[in-house]
């Protein structure tokens, strides 16, 4: 996976070189180590900060030519706001602010990991490192000519000066693997659809075998034998046959019940016969954001040797118009035996998930299942791009997901489920139809999925607004966000993973 910067840790005593980055709070105070590093130039720097009307707000940045007496060429001051009020994810954002100020010429950068109240804890220094890597990522491999501003932070070597190098490295080791998982998810979402189609996506998921993940790929023949009629109906119009990929990480006790994560992987969605408008159809390469998250999560958990058994399952298809494509009015039989009338071929993601959810629930009997899908435009109307929609049949699981969202910044908002919505997907000809009215569209989609989880505790995350194309954030300027990897890693680590 590409990395625009290299991040390491050095002791406070190490000499700064190239560009020096320091932190100050909203009172414009520096810590003692920072003051010592600035030396005789400290008073000059303080005057320059005051003269610039810099307020020290969290994430704000001031770029200065280093004054005489400093053995660096450039000085960057990053504001922390009220340092005592900073939470873990706020520290990650500070790292993002650091990366945002790096430029092509910054081959060597030293960041002093100190807040005005004292040295950052090892976990905080690790969070800064994570933020730097997340924000520095960019997807530009298909550009043959790059502008100067396309190369910001490229090839920078960032040294984070800390009180305890060994402790910082230990804290960053698992975090670094999670960042790798986020970057992998972003890479998958950003890839063009002529490169990343179902068979290729399955091959990339299979690379997790290098980390000790067991990977099983179900082809059309295997899915036909399993009677996955809902998923196969979606893929039948494409020249690229569908795949289902089952990934298993056995990091817990042998035979212990696994947890499961399921992702929608529509590698390109034209809408099928119910074809979408051409405007922005190119964005539908990202309709596999849920599957990308699951692969990124499995990478993170396996790489950091998570002490838990985990199933990751993704259904991979293309939804294309063709003489062999599924039609409105068709009735398909899902793996569960339930029949589905196709009203709109553009409501295809729920059909893919229906069979994969049922397969996982029946074969692996997980403790819980969380599915992720860029499922409905309706969730964007309701929640915009700052929260994913959360639907669940289990209050404890929903509460834990909500807490993990708050701690990581990958926020969720719980939406309702209830039998009163079922009538919208009742069919005259089959057990159900694949879409209801426009009203409550994200709810009826989740209501549909609930019919395929049996009695398993389950949560559905509608990530249509958060997985791709959202406004740039403190830690992501890429089109694909990698949303969900940090959220679900935190859920597992906090509540389900065996403690050492």
From Swiss-Prot:
One record GO biological process: proteolysis
One Pfam family linked to the record: Peptidase_M17_N
Lineage, highest ranks first: Bacteria, Pseudomonadati, Pseudomonadota, Alphaproteobacteria, Hyphomicrobiales
Catalytic class of the enzyme: hydrolase
Record gene name: pepA
Cofactor note: Binds 2 manganese ions per subunit.
Protein's job: Presumably involved in the processing and regular turnover of intracellular proteins. Catalyzes the removal of unsubstituted N-terminal amino acids from various peptides.
Positions of Mn(2+) 2 binding: 264, 269, 287, 348
PROSITE patterns on file: CYTOSOL_AP
Species of origin: Rhodopseudomonas palustris (strain BisB5)
Protein name: Probable cytosol aminopeptidase
């Amino acid at each position: 996976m590409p990395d625009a910067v290299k991040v390491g840790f050095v002791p406070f005593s190490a000499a700064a070189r190239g560009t020096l980055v320091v932190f100050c709070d909203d009172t414009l105070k520096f810590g003692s180590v920072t003051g010592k590093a600035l030396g005789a130039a400290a008073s000059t720097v303080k005057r320059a900060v005051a003269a610039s009307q810099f307020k020290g707000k969290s994430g704000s940045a001031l770029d200065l030519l280093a004054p005489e007496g400093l053995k660096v060429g450039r000085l960057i001051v990053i504001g922390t706001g009220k340092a005592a009020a900073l939470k873990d994810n706020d520290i990650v954002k500070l790292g993002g602010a650091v990366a945002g100020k790096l430029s092509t010429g910054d081959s060597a950068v030293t960041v002093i990991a100190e807040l005005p109240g004292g040295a950052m804890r090892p976990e905080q220094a690790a969070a800064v490192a994570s933020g730097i890597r997340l924000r520095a990522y960019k997807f530009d491999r298909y550009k043959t000519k790059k502008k100067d501003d396309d190369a910001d932070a490229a090839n920078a070597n960032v040294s984070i000066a800390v009180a305890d190098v060994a402790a910082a490295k230990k804290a960053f080791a698992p975090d670094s693997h999670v960042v790798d998982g986020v970057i992998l998810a972003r890479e998958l979402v950003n890839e063009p659809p002529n490169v990343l189609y179902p068979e290729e996506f399955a091959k990339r998921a299979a690379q997790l075998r290098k980390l000790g993940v067991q990977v099983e790929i179900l082809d059309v023949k295997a899915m036909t034998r399993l009677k996955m009629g809902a998923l196969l109906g979606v893929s039948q119009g494409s020249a690229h046959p569908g795949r289902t990929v089952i990934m298993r990480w056995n990091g817990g006790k042998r035979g212990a019940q696994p947890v499961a994560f399921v992702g929608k992987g529509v590698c390109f969605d034209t809408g099928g016969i119910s074809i979408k408008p051409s405007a922005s159809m190119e964005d539908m390469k990202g309709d596999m954001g849920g599957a990308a998250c699951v692969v990124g999560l499995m990478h993170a958990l396996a790489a950091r040797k998570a002490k838990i058994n985990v199933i990751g399952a993704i259904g991979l298809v293309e939804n294309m118009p063709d003489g062999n494509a599924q039609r409105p009015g068709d009735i398909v039989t899902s793996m569960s035996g339930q029949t589905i009338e196709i009203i709109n071929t553009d409501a295809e993601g729920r059909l893919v998930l229906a069979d994969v959810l049922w397969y996982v629930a029946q074969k692996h009997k997980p403790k819980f299942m969380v599915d992720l899908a860029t499922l409905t435009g309706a969730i964007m109307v309701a929640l915009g791009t700052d929260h994913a929609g959360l639907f669940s049949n289990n209050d404890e699981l929903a509460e834990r997901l909500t807490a993990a969202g708050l701690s990581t910044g990958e926020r969720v908002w719980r939406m309702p489920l209830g039998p009163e919505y079922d009538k919208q997907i009742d069919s005259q000809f089959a057990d159900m139809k694949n879409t209801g009215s426009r009203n409550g569209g994200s709810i009826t989609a989740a209501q549909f999925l609930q019919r395929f989880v049996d009695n398993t505790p389950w949560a559905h995350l509608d990530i249509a607004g958060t997985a791709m194309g959202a406004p740039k954030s403190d830690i992501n300027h890429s089109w694909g966000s990698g949303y969900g990897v940090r959220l679900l890693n935190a859920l597992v680590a906090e509540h389900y993973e065996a403690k050492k």
